[in-house]
Every structure is written in C-alpha cells, then in structure tokens.
C-alpha cells in the first residue's frame, strides 16, 4: 500500500482530541482493569460495522459463519497448541477449568475433533466472530497504548480443513481473502513471510498482514495466516477417509484473522483523520456505519 496517501493530519489515535469519550479506558480500568475499554456511541457502532463487513465479505468468499462457544475445555486448547505452550497467557476459570478463548481458532478447529469428514467436502471453510481474551503478560511501552494491545478485543477468524496435497495453495487463498478486506478498507498494508524463528512450534508456514498507522508511523499486525499441516489434526484426531487408500488420513488445518478489530480501527482513525478532527469512513464501510464521518465531539 501507499503509505504516503494517508492523511497529512494523522496523529496517534490515542492522541486525537475526544478519543477518550468514545474509547473509555478509564472507566474500563475501574470496572475490570487495564486493557478492557468501553466503546461508547459511534465507537461501538463502528465496531459493529466492521464485524458485519468482515463477516459479509467472508461469506462472499465461501466461508460458512459459525457462532462458537467462547469458553473451551483443556482438551480443546491442547488440540490447537494453546496448552501447554500458552497456558500463562489465557484466562482460566475455576473450579471448572474452562479457558476464555484467545481466538476463535480454538473452538472452530475443535468442531470436527474425533471425527472423520468426507474427503469430497474438502476444503471446508468456516468463519467466526468472537471476543478474544489474552493476558498479554510482559507487554509494555508504546505497544500497549490505546487500541494497540488489549486484554479483550473483537476478531473474526477464518479457518479451513483441507486435503494435505493442497494445503499450501489453500493458505495462499486464505491470505488473499484477508488481504481483500484491507484493500476494500483502503488501508496501506504489507505482507510478511515469517522466518522459522518467528513460527510457533505448531506452525509450518505463516504470513503476517500489517497495516500502516500513519499517526504512530508504524506497522500494526492485524492478521496472521498459518498452515499447521497435520499438527492440530493429529492432536484433535480430525481425519478424512482417502478414496485412494480407503484408510483415514489426517487433514491439514489453516487459519487466519479476518480481521482483528482494534488495530484496524486505529489505522482507520489515524490514516483518515481530517483537519476538523473528524475521521472519514472508508466507502465500503459507510453502508454498515450509516455515516461518512466519525466525530469525537
């Protein structure tokens, strides 16, 4: 994307006059703690607009929408690789030992746990919106200011169960589906192919999508698109019966954010800030938001 095309009036979203009226971090901190803001008035409306836009575009791309549980058991979190690797980053309930989902990837992937799916149905494509909950222990500095890093945030997830022979082609298609959202929102972005040192132990290949935040003058990650090959499927025992051999074989699982809302919001605010303090809403979002501008006063 062309980062020079952003507003000449861009400032960091958290420094925009009136930001705290629509994104109330102080009251959120009082009620829950740091990183749990209230979205008030048109801020809440804009979140709802983004989620509706994401889900509608994902449906056009062939993903079937699912509304999943937002708490999962230890078996589900183990199947996707959150346990034991990220146990300290998740919110856990007692005495039931259920975990608040850090991403819809966890309940969605487990949809077919301990099942054999029809090979003819592959690839199976699903999308889901959930609030996501992450402790983010150890985060500090500019990375946590404003909407950059929250303990609770909204995200739409894309997920595919695919035949092993096509999993890398399907990963590229999934990445393009996420890119399509950024293009329609007219946000400058870049695609990073992550090196082995930046992969989780469960991932075989990962792309990160980052948007340019013109006020902060930095790139913000809004999506990671990953191929897990058979790692999650082996833990979850998700298989298909091969027509060629007649035996059950493991599927490959892929997922990616489509997209994470807070940083997309931050980029829209910063890149589209006008001289009068209003924010111009991307044209694709206007039918969902109902207005052409977001005002902070």
Model regions and ranges:
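TRNA-recognition modules of translation machinery and tRNA-sensing kinases, especially anticodon-binding
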Residues: 2-297
């Amino acid at each position: 994307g062309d980062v020079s095309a952003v507003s000449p009036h861009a400032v960091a979203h958290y420094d925009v006059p009136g930001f705290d009226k629509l994104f109330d971090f102080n009251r959120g901190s009082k009620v829950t703690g740091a990183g749990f803001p209230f979205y008030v008035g048109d801020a809440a409306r804009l979140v709802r607009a983004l989620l509706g836009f994401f889900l509608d575009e994902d449906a056009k791309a062939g993903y079937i929408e699912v509304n999943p549980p937002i708490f999962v058991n230890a078996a589900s979190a183990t199947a996707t690789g959150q346990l034991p690797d990220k146990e300290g980053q998740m919110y856990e309930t007692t005495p039931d030992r259920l975990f608040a989902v850090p991403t819809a990837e966890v309940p969605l992937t487990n949809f077919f746990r301990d099942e054999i799916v029809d090979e003819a149905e592959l690839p199976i494509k699903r999308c889901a919106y959930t609030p996501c909950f992450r402790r983010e222990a150890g985060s500090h500095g500019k990375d946590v200011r404003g909407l950059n890093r929250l303990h609770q945030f909204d995200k739409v997830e894309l997920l595919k169960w695919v035949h092993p022979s096509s999993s890398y082609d399907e990963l590229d298609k999934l990445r393009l589906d996420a890119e399509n959202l950024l293009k329609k929102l007219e946000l400058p972005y870049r695609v990073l192919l992550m090196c082995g040192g930046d992969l989780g132990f469960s991932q075989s290949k990962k792309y990160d999508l980052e948007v340019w935040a013109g006020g902060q003058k930095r790139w913000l990650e809004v999506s990671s698109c990953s191929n897990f090959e058979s790692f999650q499927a082996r833990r979850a025992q998700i298989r298909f019966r091969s027509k060629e051999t007649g035996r059950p074989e493991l599927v490959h699982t892929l997922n990616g954010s489509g997209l994470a809302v807070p940083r997309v919001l931050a980029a829209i605010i910063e890149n589209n800030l006008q001289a009068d303090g209003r924010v111009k809403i991307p044209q694709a979002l206007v039918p969902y938001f109902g207005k052409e501008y977001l005002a902070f006063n």
